[in-house]
């Protein structure tokens, strides 16, 4: 996915904004994360979203593991309850990303620091008001230009044309109720220069301001279930007092996952 909103359930499919004290808090909630593959195998985990803090609990190598992405304290944590141990990585302010906060403007360069953007026009696309932008990026001595039509209401790209000729489109298909929640169903289509295309469907929850389900081609889907909107207790995002800090070399027997100890923790998707 070339766009800033590429979907990963161990990431996010909407452009995230850097967290700072000046930004509003995200909606707090808890939910079950369910992922299914074409062979019908399902994987489940539990997510807790606090005030600029996210906790994910899951099973790995027969052990419970907990990932915490704590933007308030600029750190990422990995907890292993069976060993009463944890690892910690400091996250610089400029690296912090909170996918639970909606984008605050339509300039696509606000998400890609090394790019330069120029506003070309205000238009209507797929029945929605958009602004058209040109983005210029210098990469390996080459100047790459792309076009982006950004939705004025949601600040997300409805259409993107990339230097290699590929095109990404996002269209609102209608309102639907999913697991008792009011959502909007969006269809995303990625077309390649050779004519091949991939289509996915996303259900966006206006209250949470994230997408709570995505269906991918081939039988993949991932979603949030049993969503409960409520403030989350602070202890979910702290290290228990009896836990010992260890280094990755000391952690055994399971190797740490590639989640919160990198730049991002696993998050649900956002439009």
How would you label these PLM feature ranges?
Residues 1-5:
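Positively charged n-region of N-terminal signal peptides that target proteins for export
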Residues 7-16:
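Bacterial N-terminal signal peptides
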Residues 19-55, 61-63, 83-84, 89, ...:
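N-terminal cleavable signal peptides for secretion/export
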Residues 21-23, 38, 82, 125-126, ...:
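Non-transmembrane domains of secretory- and envelope-associated proteins
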Residues 38-39, 138-147, 192-196:
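Short, cysteine-centered beta-strand-loop-beta hairpins and adjacent loop/turn segments enriched
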Residues 44-49, 68-69, 116-122, 171-176, ...:
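Short, exposed beta-strand/loop patches in secreted or surface proteins that constitute
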Residues 48-110, 121-161, 217-226:
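An acidic-aromatic
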Residues 107-119, 162-171:
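A short, amphipathic edge element
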């Amino acid at each position: 996915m070339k766009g800033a909103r590429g979907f990963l359930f161990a990431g996010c499919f909407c452009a995230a904004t850097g967290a700072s004290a000046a930004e509003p808090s995200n909606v707090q909630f808890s939910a079950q994360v369910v992922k299914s593959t074409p062979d019908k195998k399902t994987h489940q985990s539990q997510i807790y979203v606090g005030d600029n803090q996210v906790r994910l609990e899951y099973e790995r190598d027969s052990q419970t593991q907990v990932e915490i992405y704590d933007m308030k304290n600029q750190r990422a944590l990995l907890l292993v309850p069976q060993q009463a141990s944890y690892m910690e990585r400091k996250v610089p302010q400029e690296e912090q990303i909170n996918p639970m906060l909606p984008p605050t403007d339509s300039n696509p360069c606000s998400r890609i620091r090394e790019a330069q953007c120029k506003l070309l026009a205000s238009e209507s696309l797929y029945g929605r008001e958009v602004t058209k932008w040109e983005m210029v990026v210098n990469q390996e001595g080459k100047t790459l230009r792309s076009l982006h039509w950004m939705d004025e209401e949601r600040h997300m790209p409805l259409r993107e044309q990339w230097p290699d000729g590929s095109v990404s489109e996002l269209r609102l298909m209608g309102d639907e109720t999913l697991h008792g929640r009011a959502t909007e169903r969006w269809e995303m289509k990625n077309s390649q220069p050779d004519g091949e295309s991939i289509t996915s469907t996303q259900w966006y929850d206006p209250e949470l301001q994230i997408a709570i389900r995505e269906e991918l081609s081939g039988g993949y889907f991932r979603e949030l279930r049993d969503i409960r909107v409520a403030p989350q207790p602070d202890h979910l995002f702290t290290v228990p007092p009896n836990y010992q800090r260890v280094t990755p070399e000391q952690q055994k027997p399971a190797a740490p996952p590639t989640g919160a100890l990198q730049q991002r923790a696993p998050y649900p998707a956002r439009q």
